[in-house]
Amino acid sequence: MYRKSTLAMLIALLTSAASAHAQTDISTIEARLNALEKRLQEAENRAQTAENRAGAAEKKVQQLTAQQQKNQNSTQEVAQRTARLEKKADDKSGFEFHGYARSGVIMNDSGASTKSGAYITPAGETGGAIGRLGNQADTYVEMNLEHKQTLDNGATTRFKVMVADGQTSYNDWTASTSDLNVRQAFVELGNLPTFAGPFKGSTLWAGKRFDRDNFDIHWIDSDVVFLAGTGGGIYDVKWNDGLRSNFSLYGRNFGDIDDSSNSVQNYILTMNHFAGPLQMMVSGLRAKDNDERKDSNGNLAKGDAANTGVHALLGLHNDSFYGLRDGSSKTALLYGHGLGAEVKGIGSDGALRPGADTWRIASYGTTPLSENWSVAPAMLAQRSKDRYADGDSYQWATFNLRLIQAINQNFALAYEGSYQYMDLKPEGYNDRQAVNGSFYKLTFAPTFKVGSIGDFFSRPEIRFYTSWMDWSKKLNNYASDDALGSDGFNSGGEWSFGVQMETWF
């Protein structure tokens, strides 16, 4: 009985243990399945979140791409507008107005009229100028009207007309003594698209004009070289990056052109070469039958006048004060023979002899000396022989110095000293007498400007001035109809006072 009970209990325990073990395994599996399901759910959630983020990112990328495209389009539009504006800014098409004028009044120390002008000395007849500051009483005006256009093919056109007038009268109405004159009227054609090689970018011109590359010494009112007339030519033929040339043909008339018997014309063929700061200019002149030209009374004007001539210029244009300091300077050596012996105004003097020879040197510079002081020296000298009569001689030299002392931005004190020596032997031509001697001029001029007070080339200016002049007594005898020695204007010292305006734009 005991063994049966014991066996029954053992069987019951084993059965219970197996059942408990089985129950434990099922619970563990269910727990694992639940955990796995939870992890799967979390993974799905994370995947969904990632998918949402990816969608948002893709949408943002699409938005950015669209914005970038919009910005690109906007940038292109801005670039196109900018290009159009730049083209419009560069396009100088339209009308322009430019001008030059000077006008003033002058008197001597007695409150009466006096002589003045840059060419009042005997040397002035052959181009010997002196300082102009406080030494001009005329009214002279130049008015320039231009029309420019740029075509779609890049070609340019320019038309210019200049009207000028000069007066010595102080009256407001001067029509009866007016010298109103059309000094220039010409057309230029530039950047022609069919021009290639050296002619690419060159400019054709024709008409009545001052040559583009003339230059002067402003303080003594003298051109270094002045080529002008009616004709045609071409500018800026470029042989290489450093060498360019101009070629032109000008025509001028000698004598009274109203005289129907005067058919003498002077033709000037010019080559003008530029290599960096260097300039080399050569001209040939011809005036057929100039020695047979008659005046308005039918008399022979000058039987020994030249029919041909040559002219040459060697120039140096510096962008510094003779290479020594900041500033600018220009220097030129000129030579002329025959009709070319008038070396400043090429082809303007029909009385020159076939054997006439002239040498001239010209130089000027500008430089600041300090914050308030600036200086502009100038020199002009000439030697001419066999000019109008056999054996004649005209020698002179001018030295000029102008100083500017800036007081403030609108007021300066200008000082000018001018000295000229001359030795003239005209050999009786035009009843002129042989003389030699010196001329002196000193000027003090308080000056008002709107700005750039120390700039020698900025205008407008209003000047109040006083000048003192004196000269060798012998110079009074040069001619009966010139300034020196005339009534009330003799050596021994002459004072003058005045006010003048000058402007250009």
From Swiss-Prot:
CDD domains: Maltoporin-like
GO terms (BP aspect): monoatomic ion transport; polysaccharide transport
Record GO cellular component, one term: pore complex
Bridged cysteine pairs (disulfide): none
InterPro entries reported for this sequence: G_neg_Bact_CarbUptk_Porin (IPR050286), LamB-type_porin_N_dom (IPR021570), Porin_LamB (IPR003192), Porin_LamB_sf (IPR036998)
Locations listed in the record: Cell outer membrane
Top-level taxon of origin: Bacteria
Record flagged with keyword Transmembrane: yes
Region (Disordered), start-end ranges: 44-87
Signal peptide (residue range): 1-22
Gene3D superfamilies named among the record's database cross-references: 1.20.5.340, Porin, LamB type
Signal among keywords: yes
Keywords: Cell outer membrane, Ion transport, Membrane, Plasmid, Porin, Signal, Sugar transport, Transmembrane, Transmembrane beta strand, Transport
A GO term for molecular function: carbohydrate transmembrane transporter activity
Membrane topology (UniProt): Multi-pass membrane protein
Pfam families from the UniProt entry: LamB, Sugarporin_N
Family classification: Belongs to the porin LamB (TC 1.B.3) family.
Role this protein plays: Porin for sucrose uptake.
Protein name as catalogued: Sucrose porin
Origin organism lineage: Bacteria, Pseudomonadati, Pseudomonadota, Gammaproteobacteria, Enterobacterales
